């Protein structure tokens, strides 16, 4: 594997050993109805059942356990990150296990359920504007004030390696897999998965999926150069609003086979299908992968790519955004 990448497969193997005692081996589920709709065999890697409700605990815990001891003598005074919610929850949980204070920079537009969960795990929340620039500027200020260290949600190598452990599990759970479809925001998960897959079984395709309203990964692949979103994206898939970065881009450029973009309606439809047909309460970000497989663009993929594993990235749903939940009143005691 090219030395220019920020991680190697050895880092993923190390991450697996580092975190396996504290994360769930999440199940892979299937649906005959969704197979019929897609015209392929679909396997759903259910990271919504992971600790803190998303795949993010893998990278966060690997960073806390692996990065921090190598960085400072003893425990750091604090860890800091910026996150739309899931990485913030994961880092807070991981830091709490090690007795380290956590400060999470959260965009004001983040779902309320994710903000409440971060607070419930014991972190201090600091709000920012929804742009990448604002998040990073506020995080740097908090780092200076707390003398903490930054654990970037998707560009930190230890985080990327941790996310790559998903692929190790998939290859064991679905040995005949032909492709993985992964939602992409900052690219940490798809980069870690691509490093792992292309090392162990390079014939397996790795596809990224993202909202057309936040298509920086697609544009970057199209142009052959890193092309971040110019403005904060407007999408229901709040977990993939971040742009890919300097560490994830080279891996995506070289090892991700294609990028599929999907509309907001396609995301909503796919998410609802999973709710109704599989009885899995995924968040819209997790619906992006299925939306891609059901899209017209995906019909260009060879029919030989038959067994497809879709990563259901998380299940932290803001239930108050559903009209019937808003209308429901708590029963009297």
UniProtKB/Swiss-Prot annotation:
Positions of post-translational N6-(pyridoxal phosphate)lysine modification: 56
GO biological process, one term: response to lipopolysaccharide
Alphabetical list of CDD domains matching this protein: Thr-dehyd (cd01562)
Residues binding Mg(2+) 2: 178
EC annotation from Swiss-Prot or TrEMBL: 5.1.1.18, 4.3.1.18, 4.3.1.17
Cofactor(s) of this protein: Mg(2+); Mn(2+); Ca(2+); pyridoxal 5'-phosphate
Residues the record lists as binding Ca(2+) 1: 69
Record-listed Phosphothreonine modification sites: 71
Leader peptide range in chain numbering: none
Induction: Not induced further in the cerebellum or frontal cortex following two weeks of intraperitoneal injections of the antipsychotic haloperidol.
Gene Ontology CC entries for this record: apical part of cell; cytoplasm; neuronal cell body
Residues at which Mg(2+) 1 binds: 13
Calcium listed as a keyword: yes
Binding residues annotated for Mg(2+) 3, in chain numbering: 210, 214, 216
List of catalytic residues: 56 (proton acceptor), 84 (proton acceptor)
Organs and tissues of expression: Expressed in the cerebellum and frontal cortex (at protein level).
Modified residues (S-nitrosocysteine): 113
UniProt entry keywords in alphabetical sequence: Allosteric enzyme, ATP-binding, Calcium, Isomerase, Lyase, Magnesium, Metal-binding, Nucleotide-binding, Phosphoprotein, Pyridoxal phosphate, S-nitrosylation
Residues that coordinate or bind pyridoxal 5'-phosphate: 86, 154, 185-189, 313
InterPro entries referenced in this protein's UniProt entry, alphabetically: Ser/Thr_deHydtase_PyrdxlP-BS, TrpB-like_PALP, TrpB-like_PALP_sf
Binding site residues for Mn(2+): 210, 214, 216
Post-translational modification: S-nitrosylated, leading to decrease the enzyme activity.
Family of the protein in this entry: Belongs to the serine/threonine dehydratase family.
Main function: Catalyzes the synthesis of D-serine from L-serine. D-serine is a key coagonist with glutamate at NMDA receptors. Has dehydratase activity towards both L-serine and D-serine.
PANTHER family (alphabetical): SERINE / THREONINE RACEMASE FAMILY MEMBER, SERINE RACEMASE
Protein name: Serine racemase
Source lineage: Eukaryota, Metazoa, Chordata, Craniata, Vertebrata
Gene that this polypeptide is encoded by: Srr
């Amino acid at each position: 594997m090219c030395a220019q990448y920020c991680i190697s497969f050895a880092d993923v193997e190390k991450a697996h050993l580092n975190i396996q005692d504290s994360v769930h081996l999440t199940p892979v589920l299937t649906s005959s109805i969704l197979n019929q709709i897609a015209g392929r065999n679909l396997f759903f890697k259910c990271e919504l059942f992971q600790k803190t409700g998303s795949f993010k605990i893998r990278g966060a815990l690997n960073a806390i356990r692996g990065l921090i001891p190598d960085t400072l003598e003893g425990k750091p005074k604090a860890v800091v990150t910026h996150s739309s919610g899931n990485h913030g929850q994961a880092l807070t949980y991981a830091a709490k296990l090690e007795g380290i204070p956590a400060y999470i920079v959260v965009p004001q537009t983040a779902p309320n359920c994710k903000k409440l969960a971060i607070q419930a795990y014991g972190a201090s929340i600091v709000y920012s504007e929804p742009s990448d620039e604002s998040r990073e500027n506020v995080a740097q200020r908090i780092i200076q004030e707390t003398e903490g260290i930054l654990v970037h949600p998707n560009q930190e190598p230890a985080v990327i390696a941790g996310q790559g452990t998903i692929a190790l599990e998939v290859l064991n759970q679905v040995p005949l897999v032909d492709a993985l479809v992964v939602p992409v925001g900052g690219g940490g998960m798809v980069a870690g998965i691509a490093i792992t897959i292309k090392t162990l079984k390079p014939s397996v395709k790795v596809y990224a999926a993202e909202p057309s309203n936040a298509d920086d990964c697609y544009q970057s692949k199209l142009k052959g150069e890193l092309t971040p979103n110019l403005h904060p994206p407007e999408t229901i898939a709040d977990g993939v609003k971040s742009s890919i970065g300097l560490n994830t881009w080279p891996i995506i450029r070289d090892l991700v086979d294609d990028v599929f973009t999907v509309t907001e309606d396609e995301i909503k439809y796919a998410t609802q299908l999973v709710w109704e047909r599989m009885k899995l309460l995924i968040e819209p970000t997790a619906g992006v992968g299925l939306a891609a497989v059901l899209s017209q663009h995906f019909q260009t993929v060879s029919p030989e790519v038959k067994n497809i594993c879709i990563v259901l990235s998380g299940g932290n749903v803001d239930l108050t955004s559903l009209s019937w939940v808003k209308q429901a009143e708590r029963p009297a005691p």
